[in-house]
């Protein structure tokens, strides 16, 4: 088996996690108490969904997941919610004291006390796997727990499970909508370790997803639940090929191989189509060509950056539902002829496609319409650098005056860590610039010394 362990850290990670597991359960017909009436092989078996669920002898399906937070309120909602019987109580780890939006508290003082417990639980899950493929890590880098404890866990996972791939789904601060003043600090410090310790990171951004909900689903005032359900569709599409059998299956390591041209250039944009409300879906013909086009629309991107300002290096299209390879090839050919979608000149093919025959499921009473086919795109575009340059700019404004820095130093950090992380991000911005530049100086000009 190719099992994946999901790790949900901090409030954002946990709430996205709730939406994802709710959707997985729907897709596989698993009830909130973990029973699965349709499962013929009770107590194990080699079903494809066993990559995400482990089965007990009593026929109960338990998610291979860990939820961690430094304060109890969010995890208590899981403990008392609809899916309280789905999770093993040991999988829900909560501390007593908040990270208070402070990276240093999440990484050094408070996170340090809880991290061994987390690794212990992860070790138990890993021992329960026959062929662990990797980790999916969900967190946000604006807060204290997601950024601090998230980085700490990633660093420790690299030590304990060196070769296993780590995919991050990371919520980055939005340009306009901010939830805390020190977001830029936390994000820069946290990205510093995301660079080292994740193999692929998919960037999400609340503002971009708000706009998609507002525009495509006509929700006037989207809530986090609306956002998370949209994000969970993306994550479900990515992992569908691990959980179902399909025509062109893509596993986690394939993403890495096809999307990451250089180790540091691994921050991805994602988009999903069709995002459409039930009223509209009834009147529209959502062909493969149409949904492929709308996945490339700048307004469909789930992070606030405009792919027209950069070039694509590679992209991965995951179709699900009633889709045949012939349609996909035609749709991709059309995309390639478009002038607005530019690829770097050193990556001529640039497309990786996967097809899964399981049609997309939707949460009953949710916002999305039930459709016959859908596509999720993960793309590596140089325009992602906009996300970083925005955060870096805000970081510089604050750090020039050393505003709020004493809170971090008081928790045992050194100022040197700030400048080190900031320099690392400056180097990242430069890397993206070089990758997007046309090659004039032969194959490999000044990139030889980088790696």
Curated annotation (Swiss-Prot):
Its main location: cytoplasm. Its cofactor is Mg(2+). The active site is at 254. It catalyses: GTP + H2O = GDP + phosphate + H(+). It is found in: Cytoplasm, Cytoskeleton. GO terms for molecular function: GTP binding; hydrolase activity; metal ion binding; structural constituent of cytoskeleton. GTP binds at residues 11, 71, 144-145, 179, 206, 228. Keywords: Acetylation, Cytoplasm, Cytoskeleton, GTP-binding, Hydrolase, Magnesium, Metal-binding, Microtubule, Nucleotide-binding. GO terms for biological process: microtubule-based process. Its EC number is 3.6.5.-. The modification N6-acetyllysine is found at residue 40. Undergoes a tyrosination/detyrosination cycle, the cyclic removal and re-addition of a C-terminal tyrosine residue by the enzymes tubulin tyrosine carboxypeptidase (TTCP) and tubulin tyrosine ligase (TTL), respectively. InterPro entries: Alpha_tubulin, Tub_FtsZ_C, Tubulin, Tubulin/FtsZ-like_C, Tubulin/FtsZ_2-layer-sand-dom, Tubulin/FtsZ_GTPase_sf, Tubulin_C, Tubulin_CS. It comes from the Eukaryota. One of its GO terms (cellular component) is microtubule. Mg(2+) binds at residue 71. The keyword tRNA processing does not apply. Dimer of alpha and beta chains. A typical microtubule is a hollow water-filled tube with an outer diameter of 25 nm and an inner diameter of 15 nM. Alpha-beta heterodimers associate head-to-tail to form protofilaments running lengthwise along the microtubule wall with the beta-tubulin subunit facing the microtubule plus end conferring a structural polarity. Microtubules usually have 13 protofilaments but different protofilament numbers can be found in some organisms and specialized cells. This is Tubulin alpha-3 chain. It comes from Hordeum vulgare (Barley). The gene is TUBA3.
